[in-house]
Design a protein with these regions (language model features):
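Bacterial N-terminal signal peptides
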Residues: 6-17
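Positively charged n-region of N-terminal signal peptides that target proteins for export
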Residues: 1-5
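N-terminal, motif-rich segments that launch catalysis or mediate targeting to/interaction with membranes
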Residues: 22-135, 142-270
Length: 270
């Protein structure tokens, strides 16, 4: 990760001209970031502020997708597989099955190490933080935990209210955008529906748990009819909302843990 600061500097120079790519979709990712912002500890919030300045987690959550339009090899080749995981039906996740560049799980591990490394540069830590927020969101989208046979639903052609698209896009953005809400409106509505008990219950920092939840949900969302409209949206809206809420709570939980003072971590292990 030492050379990522160079790519970050290049990336920032292109940022204003880039149109968002889809992965959860920009609204979905911003929702998870906004929910996370509300659940950060004081220590985590201070560290995020040091790295991101006026940029909040809602904005940071979409940045790795924004950078997919950068033609540099880092974004087109190296970082491309970090948005998803492939686990074939009936298999367990094995990091050894990831591409040479890694996948979302291995990238999360590496970026976590960078964020906790006192010798890492601010640019490398900033890149790591943005990717951590984004990757945790992606791991909660069931089709970012694809089975390896249809590119995470991208090859499953469907019609969404008569418009040709694919199943991956339906889950990334179409079902969310159907509500015609801004990310802040949707995040506020979802946040108000999260009970204190759910915040405690969902406070899980294990990526394997998140991944297995997505795989279990993946099995239930493939339609028998390619013409999707109100029935499909109604059937799966609660599941989609839950994944967004889970992701937001867990982004915060993960960052609270990463930024927790070393002495506090040590005390918890005694």
């Amino acid at each position: 990760m030492r050379n990522t600061g160079i790519f970050l500097a290049i990336a920032l120079s292109f940022g204003a001209a880039i149109s968002p790519a889809q992965a959860w979709g920009p609204v979905g990712h911003r929702v998870t970031g906004a929910i996370a912002d509300e659940n950060l500890s004081g220590v985590a919030r201070a560290n995020v502020k040091i790295l991101l300045g006026t940029e909040d987690l809602a904005e940071a959550a979409t940045w790795p997708d924004d950078m997919k339009s950068d033609p540099a090899d880092f974004w087109q080749k190296t970082a491309s597989p970090w948005h998803y995981v492939t686990v074939r039906e009936g298999d367990d996740y094995k990091g050894s099955d990831a591409p040479a560049e890694g996948d979302a799980m291995t990238a999360l591990t590496r970026f976590t190490a960078t964020l906790r490394d006192p010798k890492a540069s601010p640019d490398d830590k900033r890149l790591a933080l943005r990717f951590i927020v984004h990757i945790i969101g992606d791991l909660h989208q069931p089709l970012h935990a694809g089975g390896g046979d249809d590119r995470g639903g991208n090859d499953v052609k469907v019609n969404w209210f008569g418009r040709p698209t694919n199943l991956h896009s339906v889950w990334d953005s179409a079902m969310i955008e159907q509500r015609s809400l801004s990310y802040s409106e949707l995040a506020g509505w979802l946040s108000r529906s999260i009970t204190p008990a759910q915040t405690v219950e969902w406070n899980n920092r294990d990526p394997l748990v998140w991944l297995h939840e997505s795989i279990a949900l993946r099995k239930t969302i493939y339609p028998t009819d390619a013409n999707l409209s109100w029935d499909y949206a109604y059937q799966h809206r609660a599941e989609l909302d839950d994944r967004l809420k889970h992701a937001g709570i867990r982004i915060a939980a993960y960052l609270n843990w990463v930024f927790e003072p070393t002495d506090a971590k040590a005390a918890k292990t005694k």
